[in-house]
Amino acid sequence: MKWLGESKNMVVNGRRNGGKLSNDHQQNQSKLQHTGKDTLKAGKNAVERRSNRCNGNSGFEGQSRYVPSSGMSAKELCENDDLATSLVLDPYLGFQTHKMNTSAFPSRSSRHFSKSDSFSHNNPVRFRPIKGRQEELKEVIERFKKDEHLEKAFKCLTSGEWARHYFLNKNKMQEKLFKEHVFIYLRMFATDSGFEILPCNRYSSEQNGAKIVATKEWKRNDKIELLVGCIAELSEIEENMLLRHGENDFSVMYSTRKNCAQLWLGPAAFINHDCRPNCKFVSTGRDTACVKALRDIEPGEEISCYYGDGFFGENNEFCECYTCERRGTGAFKSRVGLPAPAPVINSKYGLRETDKRLNRLKKLGDSSKNSDSQSVSSNTDADTTQEKNNATSNRKSSVGVKKNSKSRTLTRQSMSRIPASSNSTSSKLTHINNSRVPKKLKKPAKPLLSKIKLRNHCKRLEQKNASRKLEMGNLVLKEPKVVLYKNLPIKKDKEPEGPAQAAVASGCLTRHAAREHRQNPVRGAHSQGESSPCTYITRRSVRTRTNLKEASDIKLEPNTLNGYKSSVTEPCPDSGEQLQPAPVLQEEELAHETAQKGEAKCHKSDTGMSKKKSRQGKLVKQFAKIEESTPVHDSPGKDDAVPDLMGPHSDQGEHSGTVGVPVSYTDCAPSPVGCSVVTSDSFKTKDSFRTAKSKKKRRITRYDAQLILENNSGIPKLTLRRRHDSSSKTNDQENDGMNSSKISIKLSKDHDNDNNLYVAKLNNGFNSGSGSSSTKLKIQLKRDEENRGSYTEGLHENGVCCSDPLSLLESRMEVDDYSQYEEESTDDSSSSEGDEEEDDYDDDFEDDFIPLPPAKRLRLIVGKDSIDIDISSRRREDQSLRLNA
């Protein structure tokens, strides 16, 4: 398997099936060439006769179509190539490479042959002028690789006694042609050649083969100019006299353009065939050619060309190339009747064979036979990445990685929820590069062992506090499974022992904060007791992913705060903290705020968690009615946000009183002013809020969100309505209860049975009044079969009858109208559609997220427009988003 043999329309003679188009085809072609071209042939023959006289050649060479521009006939090319390879390549490789051995057939006038070269047909002569000088010749080649002196190397190669006898019968022109041919082979070893010749024993058709391997990176359309092919055209008589089928016809190609056979020799004759070649031959002159790269070639990659469709049998059925081995075709095809079935994802569609995929296959060590149909994208398991992040977080308090703020994928990154035992910022860190990979091809994330232990511990705590209830507006829900919206009155049967018992269970990094906050990232988050810290993510944290370190040794005194020298922060999903947007007034008296300001302290952990100073924000006057006197702390002068946390999953027994606190988290508006932290058990806010002073006043658009998961039509329904206070539509059902910058819903129980999990994360873009920006709505729902009675009871008290306790949740949503987003925005429907579509790829950031259960479509209603979203497929190419006006 060395070079071009017989093909249906390319070559004359083949190594294996040369019977079809051998002699008859040659005769027919020669007849076509001679008929109707007598005048041209006469002129050409005259030129040939003149050149033959000059060169001292006669015999059948005079019958050649014409002498090439180099003056080297086909027979001379064969002789020179055999001698050049014997001098240059054979000593270097350590074995004898392919030879034409045409000297066994002397011409009628054999004046230029030595006597030892004239043997019978049955005893072909091989060039062995360098017998006993292999080591010496190899040293010449090694020396040339260092100094690259062509003339010096040629003299050393032709310094033997054999050379005097060989050149005795050669004229000056023939000596020059031979010298140039040796130079062509010597240039293979130049440092700037970009390739090298190596032994190759892969193919069964040859014992001692060779291959050409790239030594540098070649780009597409680059010409490998030193990989030269020398061409000589063959007449019918020359073919019969010089070529022996299956022995030396490895480099004969038929030119359909010239309608003649061509002999190709030189360094390019060692290029092997591949059914997926990376190079092709291009002409560089009348009798020379070089190689052009069809695609990028890496160093160490073999350079290959395509020999033809029928070179290795019918349809190359005996081909032994790497591509046939990988595909299971050619000589590697299953010979047992039917072809071996290959695993196919979709019979109509398959991934193309690209170099990146094939190289990734080699690196990953995947099964090579599946590369034609299966994705070889590197899907890193969540646990692997998370464990690495945990190890990193034990050494560093925060690690910032600069991200491209204008990248649509990065701005839409959904920060994963931090489990209680982990401080990693993201369990899917590699998902940034794999956002286009379908979820069906991704490995499901497995929860860590420490996380399972925490869940079991939390479950035991919940059983002890099963009697605790939470009132959210008119909804009465049992167990901390429903998101609390900011400023909701919280009533519990038992008061916790103070804000000092606030502990962080896990961190939640919502997507809206990725684009809403451009402040400094949080360097430290502190918690009390053995619980893990809550990770707070600001707008800038999208580009600087923060790894937070455990601060289990930190103890908080009562009435003290965790100080954060950062901007407006993101609270945690499983903690009872409540953060209020900065443009909205906080629920504190200014005097009380000032009094408590002195008690605000920033704690540093033993491992050196650093706090980052933010710019000095303006003092925010905050007025609110406090129904019960509770310790609420804020330091608006220095700290942009001072959250005090109430963790429902505290690991200490004394903190078990906070288990009943429902899961809640809201987002803060991107104002560099302070956010108060509500740690009270029962807290009622004013219905009317005054806008606080900030750098830039922004008009706030408020929405009511209604989510119906299961109804008669079977399509989950999400309805958004503008509030009356945004000078738009009215919906007075929930004027008195809730006020938040956006809606974040997460319903979760325990994760012991993953089959019962229901997850829905939605990113919806809205255009606020000026149409200059968009924001996101994030909804996370997890189905749980337990405690359906309490959920249903709360929903019935709200006056709504639902078959499923998760079927209806109403809340309010605020959209801050400002133009700091890096992302383009369109009208409501198109923006919502884009966000929903992209959410199909971002919704598996959480460790315990699983693909959506049977629900096939989700209907999003914004005003008079609605969108039906197909949530059963993870493919971006699925054109399943339909806009219904």
From Swiss-Prot:
Region (Disordered): 1-62, 363-444, 590-655, 716-740, 816-850
Subcellular location: Nucleus; Chromosome
Residue(s) of cross-link: Glycyl lysine isopeptide (Lys-Gly) (interchain with G-Cter in SUMO2): 555
Residue stretches of biased makeup (Acidic residues): 816-827, 833-849
UniProt catalytic activity: N(6)-methyl-L-lysyl(20)-[histone H4] + S-adenosyl-L-methionine = N(6),N(6)-dimethyl-L-lysyl(20)-[histone H4] + S-adenosyl-L-homocysteine + H(+); N(6),N(6)-dimethyl-L-lysyl(20)-[histone H4] + S-adenosyl-L-methionine = N(6),N(6),N(6)-trimethyl-L-lysyl(20)-[histone H4] + S-adenosyl-L-homocysteine + H(+); L-lysyl(20)-[histone H4] + S-adenosyl-L-methionine = N(6)-methyl-L-lysyl(20)-[histone H4] + S-adenosyl-L-homocysteine + H(+)
Entry-linked InterPro entries: Hist-Lys_N-MTase_N, KMT5B_SET, SET_dom, SET_dom_sf, Suv4-20/Set9, Suv4-20_animal
Residues covered by the SET domain: 193-308
Annotated GO biological process: DNA repair; methylation; muscle organ development; positive regulation of double-strand break repair via nonhomologous end joining; positive regulation of isotype switching
Keywords: Chromatin regulator, Chromosome, Disease variant, Intellectual disability, Isopeptide bond, Metal-binding, Methyltransferase, Myogenesis, Nucleus, Repressor, S-adenosyl-L-methionine, Transcription, Transcription regulation, Transferase, Ubl conjugation, Zinc
Short name of any one Pfam family annotated for the protein: SET
Alphabetized SUPFAM superfamilies for the sequence: SET domain
Polar residues bias: start-end ranges: 24-33, 53-62, 379-392, 410-436
Molecular function as annotated in GO: chromatin binding; histone H4 methyltransferase activity; histone H4K20 methyltransferase activity; histone H4K20 monomethyltransferase activity; histone H4K20me methyltransferase activity; histone methyltransferase activity; metal ion binding; S-adenosyl-L-methionine binding
Biased composition, class Basic and acidic residues, residue ranges: 35-51, 590-606, 624-641
Gene3D superfamilies: Histone-lysine N-methyltransferase, SET domain
Superkingdom of origin: Eukaryota
UniProt biased composition (Low complexity): 367-378, 393-402
Positions of S-adenosyl-L-methionine binding: 98, 203-206, 210, 257, 272-273, 320
Assembly with partners or alone: Homodimer. Interacts with HP1 proteins CBX1, CBX3 and CBX5. Interacts with RB1 family proteins RB1, RBL1 and RBL2. Interacts (via C-terminus) with FRG1.
Function description: Histone methyltransferase that specifically methylates monomethylated 'Lys-20' (H4K20me1) and dimethylated 'Lys-20' (H4K20me2) of histone H4 to produce respectively dimethylated 'Lys-20' (H4K20me2) and trimethylated 'Lys-20' (H4K20me3) and thus regulates transcription and maintenance of genome integrity. In vitro also methylates unmodified 'Lys-20' (H4K20me0) of histone H4 and nucleosomes. H4 'Lys-20' trimethylation represents a specific tag for epigenetic transcriptional repression.
Medical condition linked: Intellectual developmental disorder, autosomal dominant 51: A disorder characterized by significantly below average general intellectual functioning associated with impairments in adaptive behavior and manifested during the developmental period.
Designated name of the protein: Histone-lysine N-methyltransferase KMT5B
Organism: Homo sapiens (Human)
